[in-house]
């Protein structure tokens, strides 16, 4: 309760107090981090005088846990996935957040009613909705005969070339089931059975020799750009940046999108707690989340922000069709299920790693 009270007190005031403080934010690097710098950090520093130091990590939850366990917390705000936010909160690593103290929408709607479902947790506040999607190099396939579905991703006979997949079961097993005909709404029911797990691995077996495994978010875009793969799964914001900002000949397949949210959390014993609390409030208000969509194709976690999403920073590209929350993107999308993975992550990861090691 004490940490909740501190947060509530810090967020209640309408204005920020300028100081010579700094706040250390751990995020994911790349185009996503750049979007945070432009939408959150620069205006935050201009308004408060607080310098924002960005630290990139392949998975910010990893250094957060390590710092807490070592008793040496050096960063203040971490951008993590939902499942990690839940786990770290349960482990007592994070402060609790008073949602009533978060900024209301411009029309006065309380934050608890303005954030999308699942965006507010005991110890976390979501900032974006994002997706892992399939992308392909259009130059690798004849016009009029290009891949269109998750099933095509697994069809190397008609759509030849190497495939990029993440080296983890969460964003790999589901796609195998989608490609094998399982509807998105039934993925967790099927994957929760022994038969479903066998079915997923059997489907992965069909392309195992053609897979190039990736771990960091920047890798799949580079794999496509270097011609090492003809198709890959990739974070939708990363591939949007390559397509629009860098004019790469890539396209997105929304079929079988895996949707997730990123959330801001603050560890207990953060060295710049007051600045961290100010940053959390600032970065999750309606306008800042809408502004982020000018720089990357991730959907804001507030309903009031979605109404303000317009053009990309080039002043030409409409962002709405590129959002993971667009109607086309949602047609056969799978939403992350933290409860499922809390129950099954260990066993499926062990099975996945054993499968990787097998011939």
PLM region spans:
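Conserved C-terminal helix/tail region of periplasmic/extracytoplasmic solute-binding proteins
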Residues: 326-359
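A ligand-binding cleft/hinge motif common to bilobed small-molecule-binding domains
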Residues: 85-87, 231-249
